[in-house]
Amino acid sequence: MDTLARVKKILRDTLNLGDRAEKLTAESPLLGGLPEFDSMAVVTVVTMIEDDLGVTIEDDELSADVFATVGSLAEFVSQKAAA
């Protein structure tokens, strides 16, 4: 499964998006774009990414830019997995 697909699956499961997750693209906005994507969802998504990839994400690595779009989050996840 590629990184974008993994991120979409995590978002689908975390935010209970159901079939709406299939419409997400790399350009789909997260912050301000999905009402379900609030501060608690950010924490849950980060935890699921850490568990899924076996990585640790430090607080200072996170910014609004990481969560701007599905693609920006997937790029961040890809970089963490490669490190």
Q: What label would you give each PLM region?
A:
Residues 1-37, 41-46, 51-52, 56-83:
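Phosphopantetheine-dependent thiolation modules in NRPS/PKS and related acyl-activating systems
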